[in-house]
């Protein structure tokens, strides 16, 4: 128990002092003081479905919104403890690449680290522009929930996580999410839906080095996990707050990176969805 308390204190440490005073200096007639807190959403979808393109489009269309990107760079460059400055950082390796190369060896390590990095992102104090916004909106690129119900769950089902690793991961995941429940609330999911074949084509186009060994079968597995959770509602969930969160499903099978009309349609749907939350 002592070790658990120490772990929690360290996880809270970067945020606790800031979390007590994020509203200082904000007029009581503006921003969060004016009423409800930010509407918080998560963008979900398969590997290479187009999340990065979608995030850029969101940022351009709604600059007043805060969009937190997936911490992929952190996974690609694990730094030794105590070497926070980039110029002196000692890299311990590319964990994302290690996981794809040897999933049976590194999946548990990767999922533990990816979950913690996502949790830290969702625990960050609200940035100034959210505090000043009349209708604040915060959007995350994936969430602590998809970390478990999509990726970790799939790794267990395809044999990359052992029974004991899956049990331990779920235990930590549940404990930490219950501990921080009030600070990681989400109000909606935006599901970018595309076929595994389309995702594979886009994966080849972006040519991320770590992903060159990914096959269609893996993308089909992840597609099935997304559909079960967000469409068919057959995934067994362990958090009551997740049960009734609305889902906006956006068909992104057609390339929208250069198609202005498609972009406008997508942004219009997102705006309507957010307004109704």
UniProtKB/Swiss-Prot annotation:
It comes from the Eukaryota. Coiled coil: none annotated. The active site is at residue 141. Keywords: Acetylation, ATP-binding, Disease variant, Kinase, Mitochondrion, Neuropathy, Nucleotide-binding, Primary mitochondrial disease, Progressive external ophthalmoplegia, Transferase, Transit peptide. It is found in: Mitochondrion. SUPFAM superfamilies: P-loop containing nucleoside triphosphate hydrolases. Its EC number is 2.7.1.113, 2.7.1.76. One of its GO terms (biological process) is dGTP metabolic process. The modification N6-acetyllysine is found at residue 275. Substrate binds at residues 70, 100, 111, 118, 142, 147, 211. Residues 1-39 form a transit peptide. GO terms for cellular component: cytoplasm; cytosol; mitochondrial matrix; mitochondrion; nucleus. Changing residue 44 to K: In PEOB4; decreased protein levels. Ubiquitous. Highest expression in muscle, brain, liver and lymphoid tissues. The keyword Disulfide bond does not apply. Phosphorylates deoxyguanosine and deoxyadenosine in the mitochondrial matrix, with the highest efficiency for deoxyguanosine. In non-replicating cells, where cytosolic dNTP synthesis is down-regulated, mtDNA synthesis depends solely on DGUOK and TK2. Phosphorylates certain nucleoside analogs. Widely used as target of antiviral and chemotherapeutic agents. Homodimer. Belongs to the DCK/DGK family. This is Deoxyguanosine kinase, mitochondrial. It comes from Homo sapiens. The gene is DGUOK.
């Amino acid at each position: 128990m002592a070790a658990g308390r120490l772990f929690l204190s360290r996880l809270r440490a970067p945020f606790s002092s800031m979390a007590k005073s994020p509203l200082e200096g904000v007029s009581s007639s503006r921003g969060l003081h004016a009423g409800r807190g930010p509407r918080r959403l998560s963008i979900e979808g398969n590997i290479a479905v187009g999340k990065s393109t979608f995030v850029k489009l969101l940022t351009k269309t709604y600059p007043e919104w805060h969009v937190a990107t997936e911490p992929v760079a952190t996974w690609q460059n694990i730094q030794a403890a105590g070497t926070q400055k980039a110029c002196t950082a000692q890299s311990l390796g590319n964990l994302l690449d290690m996981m794809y190369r040897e999933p049976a060896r590194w999946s548990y390590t990767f999922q533990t680290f990816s979950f913690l990095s996502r949790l830290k992102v969702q625990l960050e104090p609200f940035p100034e522009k959210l505090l000043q916004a009349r209708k604040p909106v915060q959007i995350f690129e994936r969430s602590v929930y998809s970390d478990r119900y999509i990726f970790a769950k799939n790794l267990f089902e395809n044999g990359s996580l052992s029974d004991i690793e899956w049990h331990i991961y779920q235990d930590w995941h549940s404990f930490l999410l219950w501990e921080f429940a009030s600070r990681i609330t989400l109000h909606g999911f935006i599901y970018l839906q595309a076929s595994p074949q389309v995702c594979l084509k886009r994966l080849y186009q972006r040519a991320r080095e770590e992903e060159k060994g990914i096959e269609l079968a893996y993308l089909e597995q992840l597609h099935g996990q997304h559909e079960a959770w967000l469409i068919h509602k057959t995934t067994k969930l362990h958090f009551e707050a997740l049960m009734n969160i609305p889902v906006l499903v956006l068909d992104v099978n057609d390339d929208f990176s250069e198609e202005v009309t498609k972009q406008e349609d997508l942004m219009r749907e997102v705006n309507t969805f957010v307004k109704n939350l």
